[in-house]
């Protein structure tokens, strides 16, 4: 049997709601984000999940913990699933960045896609034949999909 990988994004955070670029900051789920995680947990409670893997950032770990609970699973964390590092844009109000020149310290797309590939290889090697739920972030999840497909 092949390894099956399901991707989920963390619930909404305080910074998401305030349009702040989080990047690799920890982030705190807001009430809406907690509700989103609980709703997804309810929807997925009867699905067969063998492993829950999350980014090691708090917002993903907190979401993954809620999703793992009905399955009696512990959350495995990895920095490979961290969000893109936005460098000098981190912590800034997103609408104000529209006309800004991108700083040199933003994680390159090449590095982001490389991390995504490393994550896929890690999952296949570590959890062969398992159903893996991975809780990441918007951009890294898209990178995983781009590399996987």
Language-model-detected regions and their locations in the chain:
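Active-site-adjacent alpha-helix immediately C-terminal to a catalytic or transition-state-stabilizing loop
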Residues: 2, 61, 120-149
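Active-site-proximal alpha-helix that buttresses catalytic centers in soluble enzyme cores
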Residues: 3, 8-74, 100, 104
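Catalytic metal-binding/acid-base residues of hydrolase active sites
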Residues: 12, 58, 81-82, 139
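Short aromatic-enriched loop/helix-cap "lid" or pocket-rim segments at secondary-structure transitions
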Residues: 17-20, 64, 87-91, 146-147
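Alpha-helical elements of Rossmann-like donor-binding domains used by nucleotide-donor carbohydrate transfer enzymes
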Residues: 39, 62, 66, 111, ...
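Short beta-strand scaffold positions
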Residues: 54-55, 114, 135-136
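Phosphate-handling substructures
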Residues: 69-121
């Amino acid at each position: 049997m092949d390894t099956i990988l399901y991707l989920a994004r963390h619930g909404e955070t305080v910074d998401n709601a305030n349009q702040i670029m989080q990047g690799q900051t920890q982030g705190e789920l807001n009430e809406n984000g907690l509700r989103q995680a609980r709703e997804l947990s309810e929807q997925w409670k009867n699905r067969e999940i063998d492993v829950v893997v999350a980014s090691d950032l708090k917002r993903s770990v907190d979401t993954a913990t809620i999703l793992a609970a009905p399955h009696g699973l512990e959350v495995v964390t990895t920095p490979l699933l961290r969000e893109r590092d936005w460098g000098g844009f981190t912590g800034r109000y997103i609408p104000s960045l529209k006309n800004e020149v991108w700083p040199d310290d933003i994680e390159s797309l090449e590095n982001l896609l490389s991390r995504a590939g490393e994550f896929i290889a890690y999952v296949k090697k570590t959890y062969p034949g398992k159903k893996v739920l991975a809780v990441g972030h918007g951009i890294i999840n898209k990178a995983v999909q781009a590399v996987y497909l």
